A protein has these predicted regions:
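Alpha-helical scaffold segments that flank or form the walls of functional sites
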Residues: 56-57, 65, 75-127, 151-164, ...
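His/Asp/Glu-enriched, well-ordered alpha-helical/loop segment
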Residues: 237-247, 263-275, 280-359, 363-366
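Divalent metal-dependent hydrolysis catalytic cores, especially in the metallo-beta-lactamase
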Residues: 68, 84-113, 128-141, 165-176, ...
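Active-site core of metal-dependent hydrolases
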Residues: 165-283
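Active-site gating loops and adjacent loop-to-helix segments of metal-dependent hydrolytic enzymes
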Residues: 88-99, 142-165, 208-220, 231-244, ...
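N-terminal metal-binding scaffold of metallo-dependent hydrolase/deaminase domains
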Residues: 1-44, 376
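Conserved, mostly hydrophobic/aromatic
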Residues: 135, 187, 217, 323, ...
Length: 385
């Protein structure tokens, strides 16, 4: 048994939403065994480790549901060593579980990546745990492809992805390319979250897709129709719904004011902060690559040769800090956006996503500026400052 003391714990209140509590000790092994008032653990003479958090925040481990790569590795490398590298780097940023994200490439390459992810799902964690895949493309709109390769865009066909239904947890699709609701219904019946993204849909089409079961929005505002007072677009449909909306809070993909507008429009709920990072994340300025396309990184901006934004170089803990600066949102509410909300959406909240007795011992420990102190995955410390 191990213990964490002298921290500010982010825990569920009586409504289920998060609040901060001091004066508690957290006892754990591979699971959270107890959360008690400090001093009540004195009888545990068998404690093998006691960590003094020194007044830092102790939160559930973060979930990153949209990440292509980091530290020189990419999901489309379709290589177990690449996923291990991503897992270790993600743990440094407070992430304890994530969805390696594919992109629009030859489907044979996507299939290879999905098989590699399947293997990682059932293997031992080497840092952050691989939960499955976010499949971004190839079922998208050519006019909103962003940094995806238009040559490999395909019409949506559930039979194409059915062999990988156990691996795909979220799939991004342009709803205007669907002839009916059959694809959305088939995905949801197999436990796959359908996300609206890379889409030129109008408001009515997007709103219908949400009603049909597409309850997730891929990187809100980016690669979709925007808000106009006579044409509300996908953005309007997303804001006027309970769909969970991904946000890339690097101040490149979303202006600070837009982050604040979205936060208030959604009443602080149904938001999931992501990175959408590429392999250049963590490597600094210079040339990189995304799906065979040349990328240049300068500061926080990653672009293709034509100037198209090509994902981010954002670390998730930095995104939380930026979002707090821009919105003034309370830290417990921000933590819900990378724990409780995605865990509930993925059907995993009974296992992860909160500091609750019996759940997996996944922790992110950080200071007021979201600088990481320690990351614990399944009771094992994978990062410490």
């Amino acid at each position: 048994m191990k213990a964490i003391r002298n921290g500010i714990l982010i825990v569920p209140d009586e409504t289920g939403h998060f609040c901060s509590r001091e004066g508690l000790t957290l006892l754990y092994d591979e699971k959270i065994r107890a959360i008690r008032p400090e001093g009540k653990d004195a009888g545990h003479a068998d404690l093998e480790e006691v960590y003094d958090a020194g007044g830092a925040y102790v939160a559930p481990g973060f979930l990153n549901v949209h990440i292509h790569g980091c530290d020189g590795a990419d999901t489309m490398d379709a290589d177990s060593d690449a996923l291990d590298k991503m897992s270790l780097f993600q743990a440094r940023t407070g992430v304890t579980a994530y969805l390696p994200t594919t992109m629009t490439c030859a489907f044979s390459d996507i299939a290879h990546a999905l098989c590699t992810i399947r293997h990682a799902m059932h293997g031992d964690a080497h840092g952050a745990r691989v939960l499955g895949c976010h499949m971004e493309g190839p079922f998208i709109a050519p006019s909103k492809k962003g940094a995806q390769d238009a040559a490999h865009i395909l019409p949506a066909d559930f039979s194409t992805i059915e062999p990988y239904a156990d691996v795909i947890k979220i799939i991004t699709v342009a709803p205007e390319t669907l002839p009916d609701d059959a694809f959305i219904k088939a995905c949801t019946a197999h436990g796959i979250v359908v996300s609206i993204g890379h889409t030129a849909a109008d408001y009515e089409t997007a709103a219908h897709a949400i009603e049909a079961g597409a309850h997730h929005i891929t990187h809100l505002c980016n690669a979709m129709t925007g808000l106009h007072h006579r044409r509300p677009g996908v953005l309007g449909a997303a804001l006027d719904s309970t769909a969970n909306c991904e946000l890339i809070c690097d101040n490149v993909h979303l202006h600070p004011t837009m982050q604040r507008i979205i936060y208030h429009a959604k009443d602080g709920k149904h938001l999931i902060l992501i990175t959408d990072s590429l392999r250049a994340c963590g490597l600094g300025d210079g040339p990189s690559e995304l799906g065979g396309q040349k990328v240049t990184v300068r500061g926080t901006l990653a672009t293709l040769a034509d100037g198209t934004i090509a994902g981010s170089v954002l670390c998730l803990n930095d995104g939380l800090r930026i979002f707090r600066t821009n919105t003034g949102a309370p830290i417990p509410s921000i933590i819900e956006m990378v724990t409780r909300t995605p865990a509930k959406e993925l059907g995993l909240y009974d296992e992860i996503g909160s500091l609750s007795e019996g759940k997996t011992a996944d922790f992110a420990i950080f200071d007021r500026d979201f600088r990481m102190r320690r990351t614990v995955v399944g009771g094992t410390t994978y990062y410490k400052k």
